[in-house]
Design a protein with these regions (language model features):
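Patatin-like phospholipase
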Residues: 1-43, 48-314
Length: 314
């Protein structure tokens, strides 16, 4: 039996749908249960999918919420993921985002900014999906990334170096997209989306796995290498940053574990047409899921992908 690492990257609400479809397609094709992964790393949307995977609830019913119609489904999801709150924290934003950003302009200018949505809804959503596990931590190695707003560094919940917290709180912190969600406080420190540091943080596999792994599966919704027709300008920025970070991480993995096989799954143009331009669109969850299944029917059949899946997961 091969030892396996599973890396689930960020990508918003539609990115989570992409990862749901990818893991379910792989399970149907190979019989492999993603919860059998020796180590799972989740960032932002991938953190939610990591929690669902460790709860062994990776099903179509979990994604759709059961027998809801389209309107009911959207309202149901919005109650959790787009829960309104009064924007606060202007002083925090000036100190930790705006002023540092003026010295070095970039995406970090948004850090700590006032936001319209309450990340407590994300924690509640994780409990809704994963059940009691959301209030605990999985026994199997599970790492959830977030960005420490005060120290401006990546924190890996589930590791010895991070403060103890529940899985639900860690996922909320990892998913607190700047200017969309308020930061999440854990032990008195504010955290924002782990994607600020990297959309995947795949290098954490070799830093935290007990032994070299045979196979690493990386699902990266925000690291597309293709261009979408009529894409918004920011789509290319996010994908370029995601791809550059992932490329560096893959180089580290290859240099450290040269014998380890790696498969990276990125969305194609048809998937992106549903998942973009708004990755936070609840309405596009099911269309993204369905297009991903169609895409993966072709992608998994490619010999360079299927041969490795069959060797390590079947």
């Amino acid at each position: 039996m091969s030892s396996v690492g599973l890396v689930l990257g960020g990508g918003g609400i539609t990115g989570a749908a992409y990862e749901f479809a990818a893991l379910m397609a792989i399970r149907m094709a190979t019989g492999w249960n993603p919860d059998d992964a020796d180590i799972i790393i989740g960032t932002s949307a991938g953190a939610t999918v990591a929690a669902v995977t460790r709860a062994n609830r990776l099903t179509i019913e979990t994604l759709t919420g059961g027998d809801h119609g389209r309107t009911e489904y959207v309202e149901h999801m919005n109650q959790f993921l787009l829960r309104r709150t009064r924007p606060t924290g202007f002083g925090r934003w000036v100190r930790h985002g705006l002023l540092p950003g003026l010295r070095k302009p970039g995406l970090e200018m948004t850090l700590g900014g006032p936001a319209p949505f309450d990340p407590a809804g994300i924690a509640d959503y994780v409990e809704h999906l994963a059940g009691p596990l959301a209030r605990e931590w999985p026994e199997k190695t599970t790492l959830i990334t977030a960005f420490d707003l005060l120290d401006r560094r990546l924190v890996v919940f589930g590791s010895d170096d991070a403060p103890a917290t529940s899985l639900g709180e860690a996922v909320a912190a990892s998913s607190a997209v700047p200017m969309v969600y308020q930061p999440v406080e854990i032990n008195g420190r504010p955290y924002v989306d782990g994607g600020v540091a990297s959309g995947t943080s795949a290098h954490l596999v070799f830093e935290h796995a007990k032994n070299p792994l045979d196979f690493i599966l990386i699902i990266a919704p925000m690291a597309s290498e293709g261009e979408r027709t009529n894409a918004r300008f920011y789509e290319g920025i996010f994908d370029r940053l995601g791809s550059e970070s992932l490329s560096r991480e893959l180089e580290i993995i290859e240099a450290t574990w040269p014998e380890t096989d790696v498969v990276v799954l990125r969305p194609d143009a048809a998937v992106l047409a549903a998942a973009r331009p708004n990755p936070m669109s609840v309405e596009q969850t099911i269309p993204t899921f369905l297009r991903t299944l169609a895409f993966l029917r072709r992608e998994l059949a490619e010999s360079h992908v299927w041969d490795l899946l069959e060797e390590h997961l079947s």
